Curated annotation (Swiss-Prot):
Span list, region Disordered: 298-317
Alphabetical GO biological process terms: generation of precursor metabolites and energy; glycolytic process
This protein's encoding gene: Oadh
Protein name, per record: Probable 2-oxoadipate dehydrogenase complex component E1 homolog
Record organism: Drosophila melanogaster (Fruit fly)
Residues of the signal peptide: none
One Pfam family of this chain: E1_dh
Length: 919
């Protein structure tokens, strides 16, 4: 039973010490439910065997911990002799070579050792002597360690059949043939082929087979450029004609689409594959050249698909995350060690509201980054060592052994299914050419490339092995190659006439379209106030046994109820709750992500309440009755911008019917995610025809908080938009940027995101001081049916015939200007607010200015410095399209957004507020 106000402010009992020191959700909230701890005990006979042979057990554990250091997993090693490790010597543990041992309980597998010497050889064969090695001794969970040891030590029992080996060989041959064909027909193209790393095809071959057998329905992949195109062509059903058409100078999209497009190494795949007679959806997310940046995008897209299927905490709890949707990430060796976004992604792996049920990682380890060798590209022994930060197991594999990779892939897949955790495969391979095929790597890596150029290719070595074992004849291998080369030749001939099929606005995007390019559209986003009143009440409703904070009861709950009842002084947080709650009522799910979003940086939102006795979380809107069942997910993020924003972008591109909001703690910190903003959010549609309605809330405003807590860098977002300077914008601009000044405006712009039949990213220059400013409130009439977001707010004070000066501004600066006008009684001055900056609202602005026939001057006033803010954006559009000179009033040029000296700040405020009236 829920209630509004069952507790009096004075009647809240003193609370006992909580069991948990931090807020939590033991009961679960939308998007997160605690996972019950698994019970595991090492069998009694196993413990007895280990205790009775303590030193022998230590010896076995030493190989599990250190054996990887001696494993022959590097196909181009220039090390001439194998080093010795004292930790792997029997004498180190006081053991004699002929001392009898029992392997029961110590080692898995059919092989038996009767003495220490035999055991040593057996351990060397398992952990040092084959094409694979393992690292998992640092995994804290004993069940996982036991599982990994048992399954790795029996890995060789899983042998491939003849037909399976031939399938792998054919894939490797196709990959090599692709690169050979490209080199022959397009010798000057930087194709970033897979030569030297062709074994990765065996990874995907095994992964797809295991996936369908485990009832996986959808695989989402993030992958960099290396080997991307041959994989797409050989295994993922991409027509080679698409690539060849692109290389002839045409677009990868149909001719009616005005897209700027991208290079072939950024092509994506979204296909339904047929594997072992079963259907499997496969999505390779689009990637920029910023390495690893696509990884959180894939994670977010994966979680969105899991949400749509009701997995994990989005359902009844009967199936964990990852039950039917699997996330897979490929890395480059230098990029995985070097790019900080990887640490951020791993840090998110098991965080509530970001978990995806464990990701499967493959590091394609070329052992060089452009020209930089590993010891110059990281401070650790392995490129995979970052994985240890989350205790993810790592398997190292020699790239010359595709069958070993297939076996390890199956093992890694089974681990992910069993424990729903991340796991890594480090594929040690090489890059046959330089960073691209036109680059000469011998300038900087002569010894390595002496080995590379003298050795045969991986596909040829494997084909020779199969021929020797009478599995695949040389003639059959040649036939495979010739047939594929013939097919590629046919595709090349078809390329000029090839028309790419639409790969956008499909499935869940079917009912959407591109935004109109020649007009601004207007959408009624108002609702009946009785419904909004109910939603507002529900936003502060909590259970009878819930122990609310007394201050929140007074200032948040009671205050909101009073505002709703009176229909006046509706503040920012209430308007936000009405927007979100009404979207939920209409059946949309809403997600707010970022640091401290439940409470809000400025303690204004309180969409999440915390029981003061139990620390249990409660989200009132998720208990709202009636409507179509939308839910609110409050995703308190790690202290990261780049990976978190990438994750939210991944969710936004997958489902256009959900509202995805990312809030920066302060707008100043958005630049920590600049790569995601630049290469995905504002450019994804024009490069890839990938729309999104992601909302970025960026708190902004000069209030004396110095340079890092004052500015979201409006000017940078305006520079990124493709608004025109000399003609009117349509809704088709790449990003919509608003600076709303009233709660109702904020309400309408949020609801508009999902009301339209197209999707655009939205940057909201969000308030700080306006959150509690009495003047910055709205009334219930502002939310009623027929109301909408206004791109320009006109002046309601000055009489048009008396106006001699018009001040244009945007954002909270309006309120200081209005206060100054009141002080001066300067009613010959009108103040217009540009609520929308992009698209630039020239029609609405012209309509407002048409009222003022006696204007003598136009002023742009802003609180930002002259080289910042919207001045350089507004001025050319105003002067070109209005035909009048626009004067500037604001702070002078500066290299940093705001002063840290209180006296200087106050003086600047006085000056910039007075200047427009004295000009």
């Amino acid at each position: 039973m829920l209630r509004y106000l069952a507790l009096s402010e004075a009647g809240i009992a003193k609370l006992p010490r909580p069991q948990s020191r931090c807020y939590h959700s033991e009961k679960g909230v939308w998007g997160y439910k605690p996972i019950a701890q698994r019970e595991f005990q090492v069998a009694e006979d196993v413990r007895a065997s280990r205790n009775s042979q303590a030193n022998v057990y230590r010896f076995v554990e030493a190989f599990r911990q250190h054996g990887h250091k001696l494993a022959a997993v590097n196909p181009i090693s220039i090390r001439t002799s194998q080093q010795e490790l004292q930790e792997l010597s029997p004498a180190f543990y006081g053991l004699q070579t002929q001392e009898p041992v029992r392997t029961d309980g110590l080692l898995s597998g059919p092989q038996v050792a009767h003495n220490v010497a035999q055991l040593e050889q057996l351990l060397k064969d398992i952990y040092c002597g084959r094409s694979t090695s393992a690292e998992f001794s640092y995994v804290e969970d004993i069940e996982e360690r036991e599982w990994l040891a048992r399954n790795f030590e029996t890995l060789d029992q899983q042998q491939l059949g003849k037909s399976e080996r031939c399938e792998i060989a054919e894939l490797l041959i196709k990959s090599q043939a692709w690169d050979n064909f490209m080199a022959l027909k397009f010798p000057t193209v930087k194709r970033y082929g897979g030569e030297g790393a062709e074994s990765m095809l065996a990874f995907f071959w095994q992964l797809l087979r295991d996936s369908v057998q485990a009832n996986i329905e959808h695989v989402v992949l993030a992958m960099p450029h290396r080997g991307r195109t041959p994989l797409q062509a050989a295994l993922l059903n991409m027509r080679p004609a698409k690539v060849f058409r692109k290389l002839s100078g045409a677009s990868e999209f149909s001719e009616d689409i005005e897209a700027m497009s991208d290079v072939i190494s950024h092509f994506h795949v979204s296909e339904q594959l047929k594997i072992l007679g079963k259907k499997l959806s496969f999505s390779m997310v689009r990637n920029p050249s910023h390495l690893e940046a696509a990884n959180p995008v894939a994670m977010g897209k994966t979680r969105s698909k899991q949400q749509a299927r009701g997995e994990g905490a989005f359902g009844d709890g009967s199936q964990p995350f990852g039950e039917h949707v699997l996330n897979v990430i490929l890395h480059g060796d230098a990029a995985f060690a070097g790019q900080g976004i990887n640490q951020e992604c791993l840090n998110m792996a098991y965080v509530p509201h970001f978990e995806v049920g464990g990701s499967l990682h493959l590091i394609v380890n070329n052992q060089v980054g452009f020209t930089t060798p590993g010891d110059r590209g990281r401070s650790t022994a392995y490129t995979s060592d970052l994985a240890k930060s989350i205790q993810a197991p790592v398997f190292h594999v020699n790239g010359d052994d595709p069958e070993a990779l297939a076996r390890v892939t199956s093992l890694a897949f089974r681990y992910q299914r069993e424990f729903r955790k991340d796991i890594f495969i480090d594929l040690n391979c090489f890059r046959r050419w330089g960073h691209n095929e036109l680059d000469d790597p011998t300038f900087t890596n002569p010894l390595v490339y002496k080995i590379v150029h003298q050795r045969e290719s991986v596909p040829d070595l494997y084909a020779q092995q199969l021929a020797k074992e009478q599995v695949l004849s040389e003639s059959k291998a040649k036939e495979m190659r010739d047939e594929y080369m013939k097919y590629l030749g046919e595709e090349l001939a078809l390329a000029p006439a090839y028309q790419p099929p639409p790969s956008y606005f499909e499935k869940q995007w079917t009912n959407f379209q591109l935004a109109p390019s020649k007009e601004l559209t207007y959408w009624d986003t108002g609702l009946d106030y009785s419904l909004l009143h109910y939603i507002g009440q529900q936003s502060v409703t909590f259970p009878e046994d819930f122990n609310i904070h007394p201050h929140l009861l007074k200032t948040h709950v009671n205050a909101r109820l009073k505002k709703l009842e009176n229909g006046v002084k509706i503040d920012w947080s209430t308007a936000e709750a009405l927007a979100i709650g009404s979207l939920m009522y209409q059946g949309h799910n809403v997600r707010i992500s970022g640091e401290d979003v439940g409470r809000g940086t400025f303690s204004h939102r309180h969409a999440m309440l915390v029981d003061q006795q139990t620390n249990e979380m409660f989200i009132p809107l998720n208990s709202m009755e009636g409507g179509n069942g939308g839910k609110l997910e409050l995703a308190h993020s790690i202290l990261s911008e780049e990976a978190v924003l990438g994750f939210e972008y991944g969710m936004a591109i997958d489902n256009p019917n959900n509202l995805i909001i990312w809030e920066a703690q302060f707008g100043d910190f958005a630049n920590g995610a600049q790569i995601i903003i630049d290469t995905f959010i504002v450019s994804g549609e024009t490069k890839w025809m990938e729309s999104n309605a992601l909302v970025m809330l960026l708190p902004h405003g000069y209030d004396g908080a110095a340079s890092e807590h004052s500015s979201c860098r409006i000017e940078r977002f305006l520079q990124l938009c493709d608004s025109k300077e000399t003609s009117a914008d349509g809704d088709s601009v790449n990003v919509h940027i608003v600076n709303p000044t009233t709660p109702a405006q904020y309400y309408h712009v949020l609801r508009r995101q999902l009301a339209r039949n197209f999707r655009k990213p939205l940057v909201v220059v969000a308030p700080k001081t306006l959150l509690r400013l009495p003047a910055a409130t709205s009334t219930h009439e502002d939310f009623q049916p027929g109301t909408l977001f206004h791109n320009v707010l006109g002046d309601t004070i000055a009489k048009p015939e008396q106006v001699r000066k018009v001040i244009l501004c945007s954002g909270k600066h309006y309120y200081t200007l209005a206060e100054e006008r009141e002080k001066r009684q300067a009613y010959d001055t009108a103040i217009l607010r540009l609520e929308s900056l992009c698209p630039f609202p020239i029609q609405e602005l012209q309509a407002q200015l048409a009222q003022y026939g006696n204007v003598q001057s136009f002023v742009w006033s802003q609180e930002e410095h002259r080289n910042m803010g919207a001045w350089t954006f507004v001025r050319p559009r105003f002067e070109n399209l209005i035909g009048q000179q626009l004067h500037y009033c604001g702070r002078c040029e500066a290299p940093t957004p705001a002063t840290g000296i209180g006296k200087v700040h106050k003086r600047e405020v006085d000056e910039i507020v007075a200047a427009p009236f004295e000009l």
